[in-house]
Amino acid sequence: EAARHLAGNSAAANALSEEIQNETLSTGVDKVPVGTGYGYFVGGNDPGDRSIVQRVDYANDTATAAEKGPLQNGGASTAAAGNTSYGYVAGGNRPSTSTIISRIDYNSDTSVAPNRSTLSQGRVTLAGVGNNDYAYFGGGEPGPSQSSKVDRLDYSNDTSVTLVRSNLATARQTLAAVGNENYGYFGGGDAGPAKTTIDRLDYSNDSATTVAKGSLATAMYNLAATGNGNFAYWGGSTTPLSTVNRTDYSSDTTTAAAKGPLTVARDKLAATGNTSYGYFGGGSPGTMSTIDRVDFSNDTPTAVAKGPLVAARSYLSAVSPRE
């Protein structure tokens, strides 16, 4: 997501033990990783090409991200979500407020990412999250006010227009999203003042309005989020901030806990990751190429700077088959 958006939720819940379900859904029944081992940072603000797709190799994350196949229609302020096969990049400025949803094929990522579907309404600064069957794109600004709409994209029918399935409890823009196999969480954002709100979407009852859960410890907007099967990590914010908050999915009515910060204060960034690490990339002031890695197993120290983006960007999104 989104983004974060959560991408790569692929395990069938009724086929897995509770222990395995607590892993992120980018692992199969035998906990063998599913999907290619990369994260993708997509689009972003000028200067430069808004269609750029930059790939981080998790197995070699000190290297500079590699430029891959571009978006058919470049964009900034998009949202991203996906499964183990495809990443979907929705909305944004392309160059005006857009309904476009582009699809990145992880197994053919040097190809142009084509336009596949459309949102029910054009929006910028929205957030994306999903499971193995659907992506959900929520919030944002269609202009002139914030939106509460949550659109659902069916991966099995991804050329159709998305359906409005739910609404956020609080309409807002510049929010982030992340989730596990059961729920999507939309956090922070701007609805006049910055918000601490975290709304939870129940995938099994996705026509219901989202439910407000435990809040962020700090009001945050223009933030990013990623996580694993147990925790969500929310990082960065306008001011800018280096803040990272952690939500425990097993206790999601409690306030998020402050964890180790990013290496540099920033906003308008993106995040993605795998079961072990979260990668927070790009952002502002100006446009930044920094990628910070958060170690989920040791999340109280300051994040570690890893290989940078090949092109500095702000207002970008991110997605991964391993998230």
Language-model-detected regions and their locations in the chain:
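Polar, enzyme-active/binding microenvironments
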Residues: 1-323
